[in-house]
Amino acid sequence: MGKITSIEVQKRNVNRVNVYVDEAFTFACDAELIYKQGIQKDSLIDVEEIKEIVKEDEFIKCKNSALRTVEKTYKTEKELRDKLTEKGFEEDTIKRAIEFLKEYNLLNDEKYAEMYIKDRLRSQGRNKIKYALIRKGVSEDILLDKLSNIDSEDENYTAFKLAEKKYNILKKKESDKYKLSQKLFRFLLSKGYNYDCCNSIVRRLTNNEYME
């Protein structure tokens, strides 16, 4: 048990304070914890109380870091977890911060998937979108649900318009129809469209059945 002899606001960050116990610097924490924990000069404090304050301070730092991260750009839970891990926060602290953001709907993989799919469908097929979301940690259940809502006709139309634009560029450089077909087919595959869609569009544009 020690006696708090001084509480000083940090010069470089007025939102944080340095706490001295028995005239020696003991810990620093967020200023709001001083009020929440009832910390004041001349009060007594033991090691367990200090540990609890430091733990809560880590949570506040982690939470604020998480808030800044999602404020810049929306993230999946996995992306945010990875970011916070890189910054050195402990797993238990990260878990609390993530639950806090979920509570206020600032972290929602279902919402993220909807937004991502809507944006990427302008230039990509469902396969590329699917694997990108898998890498971002979106669950299989969410993926199956959201990808099933994609309108195949709209997707095929977008694929055709992309292929048409690419075809007009390629035909100026490639006179060999077979090679042109190959390049166009690979282009569509790289965009995430399925084999049947790619083959149908290539044949339509080149009047030539694609052959691998």
From Swiss-Prot:
It comes from Clostridium perfringens (strain SM101 / Type A). Modulates RecA activity. Belongs to the RecX family. This is Regulatory protein RecX. Keywords: Cytoplasm. It is found in: Cytoplasm. Its main location: cytoplasm. NCBIfam families: PRK00117.4-1 (NF001058). One of its GO terms (cellular component) is cytoplasm. Coiled coil: none annotated. One of its GO terms (biological process) is regulation of DNA repair. The keyword Kinase does not apply.
